[in-house]
Amino acid sequence: ATPYSPAHWTSTHPVDSTLAYLQYTSGSTSAPKGVMVSHGNMTAQSRCITEAGCYDADSVTLSWMPHFHDYGLVKGIVQPAWIGRPAYLMSPLTFLKRPLRWLEAIQRYHVTHSGAPNFAYRRCVETIAAEDRARLDLSGWQVASCGAEPIAHDTIDRFAEAFAPAGFRREAFFPAYGMAEYTLLISLKRESVAPTVLSLDPATLERGVVSEAKAGIAPVRQVVGCGAPVGDTRVVIAHPETLSRCAVQQVGEIWLAGASTTQGYWNNPEETARTFGATLRDTGEGPFLRTGDLGFVRDGEVFVTGRLKDLLIVRGRNHYPQDIERTVEQSHRLCRGGGAAAFSVQD
């Protein structure tokens, strides 16, 4: 028998609980962990994305996100195959070397769905010259998803303004929230309306209370909404220490339940139990997936304010590192966007 003969093939007959692949986390806040994604997780997630992602018979996708990342794998490869629509793939290096190529490909191949992290839209604004923008036609770009890192309101504003002459609509921005432990997508803006941006009082936000800033008050903390939970996803905001449900208009840890919840971490039962086995102390409901993200839900929409492990406490006050980083980046023209990192040190 040859290595390719039927004698060397064993049919697996996978069921929903069968392990499909290991998706390693980014390692941005801890050592990378292998997330166990099942076939059932994949099908549940694909149904969620299909329902929420505004796909139709004319949809065409394009992705330059790396395939080892859940964004590039699920949205770039699995989802187009699931819905049976054309998909174009571009190397991440192609985008990084010349961001214009991404937008040129969207025009050339009549792409309707393509997304990227916040930094990519910012790079397009910063590096694509006005004469190049004038040659683009982005009127067919229906869903410009944005996720995988904090979404800055000024990035949305600047990109929408810069590429409006090319036919890009602000309503095409679809902010999203997701994580590997939930296969990928947790929430996504649905309707063809502009993204929700709340102007919050930073003083009350430090205390974990959501309060819109009064007119004329400065500075304000602007938070971009990430849409409604997809499919059967249930979002609960819980106090990270008491493990009880937070009151309305209170910031807490985002907990999840749904068919996209993965099976845990490969060969790491202790961390699996900590992360995937949470129960609400006041009601006994569970199990929930603890995301480690801080946020709140308002009018059915998820808002992410930061990472629990990243929160900086200085003289008893809570500071979100992304706020400090953004302030530093905007303080001088020599400060490169995405080039600052705020963290605490022991005295």
Which sequence ranges carry the predicted segments?
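Structural core segment of the AMP-binding/adenylate-forming
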Residues: 1-7, 117-118, 123, 127
